[in-house]
């Protein structure tokens, strides 16, 4: 791997494996190396290459301001078969530009964006981590040909044009990485690949689900107070959370759906600035469970109901209060409802410390 890193540093082209296809890399801050890569690929001179990094945190060197959705997708999808085109309004603020000078802007950035890939392959990770300079890469084939999935395919395409080809065996996936462009409205898929549109939506959102029996008392209170707490932390209105990819829901394991929240619950959450007016009870189902990233149940019985519906739900389902149940205030006094709301509110504050939004 040291040889490959040295060759890249010297401006040579090096082929290496990723989890999807074999790539051919070049030093990104060298106009000569980029020109050679474009010639070998037979690529349009105006078409940019994707930057390749050895670790997810390296993206901060190139993208100075990451949106919440961008941070979320980096945390969940990298390393992995996803190339992300980030908007960069001011490349001059990027650490790499401060390090190498403004002349690298035209080499790394294209029309206010930069495409970045963080491969999930040990060879790629080690190679990229050893090179102190920015590295771009593209599939190791000439334009119009199929990307190679093994070293023989690389040599059949590029033998004599590259300084080194590193053999990492056959690639794990048969398809290419997905290419997605992030924007203010979410994302746009530029190339279909291993990561589906459905997976992308999951990567970009956080879904919290609270479960009780009838979805008229405990779980609606939890939903309303959780939504209010997150909105306050985010500096937005509760009904704007969906625009930020944050969804807080509740459901009842024994609910037929359709009913409003109980009067006691509506009144109790007002003490915390939350609003339950307009709540409509929902029945717990597999779709809600599968969509959720975090499921908090009021009792062990509710937790068992979740597991019964989706046996492989894993550790994303937990009791809201670890080790004990939250008693049902249904039919009780206003004091019973307020006591329950206080208990749930305190538990939510602790649980939110565990959740990265």
PLM region spans:
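Conserved hydrophobic residues forming the short capping helix/wall of the S-adenosyl-L-methionine
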Residues: 41, 226, 230-234, 306-310
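Conserved beta-strand segments of alpha/beta enzyme cores
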Residues: 134, 164, 247, 275, ...
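Phosphate-binding/catalytic loops
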Residues: 97, 104-109, 135-137, 141-142, ...
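Short, well-ordered alpha-helix to beta-strand connector turns
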Residues: 162, 292-293
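Active-site-adjacent structural elements in enzyme catalytic cores
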Residues: 1-211
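A short, structured active-site edge motif that brings together acidic residues
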Residues: 54, 250-254, 320-324
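Hydrophobic packing residues within well-ordered alpha-helices of enzyme cores
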Residues: 37, 59, 154, 222, ...
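Conserved active-site segments centered on acidic
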Residues: 204-290, 353-357
């Amino acid at each position: 791997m040291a040889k490959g890193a040295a060759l890249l540093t010297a401006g040579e082209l090096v082929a290496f494996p990723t989890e999807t296809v074999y790539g051919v890399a070049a030093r990104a801050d060298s106009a000569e190396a980029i020109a050679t890569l474009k010639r070998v690929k037979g690529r349009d001179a105006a078409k940019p290459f994707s930057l390749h990094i050895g670790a997810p945190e390296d993206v901060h060197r190139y993208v100075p301001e990451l949106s919440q959705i961008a941070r979320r997708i980096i945390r969940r999808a990298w390393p992995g078969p996803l190339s992300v085109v980030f908007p960069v309004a001011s490349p001059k603020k990027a650490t790499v530009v401060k390090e190498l000078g403004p002349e690298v802007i035209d080499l790394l950035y294209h029309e206010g964006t930069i495409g970045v890939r963080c491969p999930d392959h040990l060879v790629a990770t080690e190679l990229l981590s050893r090179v102190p300079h920015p590295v771009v890469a593209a599939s190791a084939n000439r334009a119009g040909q199929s990307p190679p999935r093994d070293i023989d395919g690389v040599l059949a395409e590029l033998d004599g044009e590259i300084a080194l080809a590193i053999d990492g065996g056959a690639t794990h996936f048969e398809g290419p990485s997905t290419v997605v462009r992030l924007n203010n409205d979410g994302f746009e898929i530029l190339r279909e690949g291993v990561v589906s549109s459905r997976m992308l939506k999951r990567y970009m959102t956080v879904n919290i689900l609270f479960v009780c029996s009838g979805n008229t008392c405990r779980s609606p209170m939890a939903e309303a107070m959780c939504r209010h707490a997150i909105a306050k932390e985010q500096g937005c209105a509760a009904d704007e959370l969906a625009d930020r990819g944050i969804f807080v829901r509740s459901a009842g394991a024994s609910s037929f759906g359709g009913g409003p929240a109980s009067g006691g619950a509506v009144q109790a959450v007002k003490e915390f600035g939350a609003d339950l007016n307009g709540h409509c009870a929902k029945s717990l189902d597999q779709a809600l469970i599968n969509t959720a990233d975090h499921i908090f149940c009021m009792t062990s019985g509710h937790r068992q109901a979740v597991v019964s519906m989706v046996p492989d739900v894993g550790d994303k389902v937990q009791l809201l209060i670890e080790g004990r149940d939250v008693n049902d205030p249904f039919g009780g006094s206003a004091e019973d409802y307020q006591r329950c709301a206080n208990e749930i509110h305190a538990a939510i504050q602790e649980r939110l410390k565990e959740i990265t939004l």
